[in-house]
C-alpha cells in the first residue's frame, strides 16, 4: 500500500494541472456546477485529492491495485467535468464495462463517494455544491455495484 501511495504521489507530481479545455469550446455559464467546482483546474485538484484518499482507504484500495493511475485520473476528470456540465466529454468505458467483475459492494461505492466528498472539503468546495455533484453521481452506482 505504501508503494501504491508513493507511485501515486510521483505520478501526480508529474501531471500537475497540465490539462485544460480547448479554447475553442464554449465555457459553461457562471453559476453552473462546473464553475462552482472551480472549472477544470478545480476538478483536477479534487481528483488528485481523491486519488490520494483512495490510496489510504483500506475499504477500497484493493480495487485499485492494478489500476493505470494516469488513465484513471484522466477518466475521473473527464467524468466529473461532464457530470458537472463542463466542456468535457467522457471518453471512457461505460460504468458497467469499467467495473465488470470487480464485485464492488454498496458500502465500497459509498466509501468512494465519501472520499470524493472529503477531497472536495479539502478544496473548499461549498457543501451545497458537493451535494449537487454527489446527487448526479449516485445513480452511477446502479452500474458500478455488483448485483
Model-predicted regions and their roles:
Residues 17-147:
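Core of compact, soluble alpha-helical bundle domains
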Residues 5-15:
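Bacterial N-terminal signal peptides
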Amino acid at each position: 500500500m505504501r508503494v501504491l501511495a508513493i507511485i501515486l504521489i510521483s505520478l501526480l507530481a508529474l501531471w500537475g494541472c497540465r490539462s485544460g479545455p480547448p479554447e475553442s469550446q464554449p465555457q459553461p455559464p457562471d453559476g453552473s456546477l462546473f464553475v462552482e467546482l472551480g472549472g477544470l483546474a478545480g476538478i483536477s485538484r479534487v481528483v488528485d485529492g481523491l486519488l490520494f484518499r483512495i490510496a489510504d482507504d483500506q475499504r477500497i484500495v484493493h480495487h485499485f491495485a492494478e489500476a493505470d493511475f494516469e488513465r484513471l485520473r484522466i477518466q475521473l476528470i473527464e467524468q466529473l467535468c461532464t457530470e458537472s456540465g463542463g466542456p468535457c466529454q467522457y471518453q471512457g468505458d461505460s460504468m458497467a464495462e469499467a467495473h465488470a467483475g470487480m464485485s464492488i459492494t454498496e458500502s465500497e461505492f459509498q466509501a468512494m463517494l465519501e472520499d470524493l466528498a472529503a477531497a472536495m472539503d479539502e478544496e473548499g468546495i461549498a457543501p451545497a455544491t458537493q451535494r449537487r455533484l454527489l446527487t448526479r453521481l449516485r445513480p452511477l452506482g446502479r452500474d458500478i455495484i455488483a448485483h
